[in-house]
């Protein structure tokens, strides 16, 4: 059952029929906690997508890094980061090209990624293009299954990769999720109005942070529902809570980057 609660008026949760440019601007500026669009994927489209889901090949995230079991289709840039905060380029491009070929072969119709990019393009005014690395487009369109939750963490391409990795300068990073399957209980996402600060390094927990890092901060909690979509600022600390045992939580996931030139780019 989907729903949203927000803890503080200065960190509001918005529910809308569609994403808008104002939503994207306000999330980038830190004025909103989350924006959720119920029924982002209509029921007939969602039912058709689900008939193809069994053909999607998945691999596990790096358990040494993530600690929780998670499955994914497609490439997640953080799984290709070297200890020197650089990209393991040969491995990344091989896997990204393989995933693109596999996705084309699955023939999921309608294509959830195309539906998402079209909707985000209507919101921004121009359909977002993939971020590029040395002129090559990054992979977009990861499907991710997270049933057992995550640690509290944030995402920031400018911190994760020395120099920011992309040809474009990213000045704001948003997280996009659209659920193809969701548990009836649990599996909620909580986003805090909290950005990284040096004192947080004393509250490290694996790749993320202890709950004490955000104990006094306003937050939003969103319960997933199949077909719904969610946007929030990825620089804010956030967590996925475990879902009910035996129930799947599968989402199309990517990041949106607002560039210094005022463009919108995407990657996974």
UniProtKB/Swiss-Prot annotation:
Record keywords: Amino-acid biosynthesis, Antibiotic biosynthesis, Dioxygenase, Iron, Oxidoreductase, Plasmid
A single BP term in Gene Ontology: antibiotic biosynthetic process
Effect of deleting the gene: Cells lacking this gene still produce L-propargylglycine but not L-beta-ethynylserine, that are terminal alkyne-containing amino acids produced by wild-type S.cattleya.
EC numbers, comma separated: 1.14.11.-
Catalytic activity, reaction form: L-gamma-glutamyl-L-propargylglycine + 2-oxoglutarate + O2 = L-gamma-glutamyl-(3R)-L-beta-ethynylserine + succinate + CO2
Known function: Involved in the biosynthesis of terminal alkyne-containing amino acids such as L-beta-ethynylserine, that are produced as antibiotics by S.cattleya. Catalyzes the hydroxylation of the dipeptide L-gamma-glutamyl-L-propargylglycine, leading to L-gamma-glutamyl-L-beta-ethynylserine. Cannot use L-propargylglycine as substrate.
The protein's enzyme class: oxidoreductase
Protein name: L-gamma-glutamyl-L-propargylglycine hydroxylase
CC cofactor: Fe(2+)
Pfam families cross-referenced by the UniProt entry: WelO5 (PF22814)
Organism: Streptantibioticus cattleyicolor (strain ATCC 35852 / DSM 46488 / JCM 4925 / NBRC 14057 / NRRL 8057) (Streptomyces cattleya)
Pathway recorded for this protein: Amino-acid metabolism; Antibiotic biosynthesis
Single Gene Ontology MF annotation: L-gamma-glutamyl-L-propargylglycine hydroxylase activity
